[in-house]
Amino acid sequence: TDKDGALDELFKIKEEGLAKAVGLAMGRIDIMFPILKNWDFDVIINHNRYTLLNREADEMYSYAHSKNISIFNAAPYAGGVLAKGPSNFKKITYQDASEEKLAPAREIERVCKKYNVEMGAAALQFSMKDKRITSTICGVTSVQSIEKNLAWAKTDIPEEFWNEVLKLPFSTKDPESERVYTAG
């Protein structure tokens, strides 16, 4: 981010017509948002910070949208728990989660069961229905998971469901703040 650094060079490449767009991709909002405010990016990708469980990226997404920056929201399933359900998958954003940390996901699961809505459909459409978000990026591991994502994207979800699920509490803290990274 220094003058004459990598970002300067990327924007020069765009000015010279060698690239059509310059984007910024990262997880940590505390690093990403200040960079975003100081450069004229065309697109951003952020992951795990705008889900049914977490809205840490909300302010940054509003800012980016106001600047006509395309927003790609990745990992709408919070690392899998919102696709598989907290009864089957006891991790949030790739980390083992205590019962206390799983409680908000269990509340979402409860509302999903009440309205007969699959959690994955709710999580995916939460991102897809946000007008600020240009596209939602989902990790897939097989043809079956692609088919499931496509089905979830087309699922009819009643407005009553959204009215209830959007009233549930959510975090605005970095969901990976306690994540331990190991080499290899």
Where in this protein do the model-derived segments appear?
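Beta/alpha (TIM)-barrel catalytic core signal, keyed to glycine-rich beta->alpha loops juxtaposed to Asp/Glu
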Residues: 1-167, 171-172, 178-184
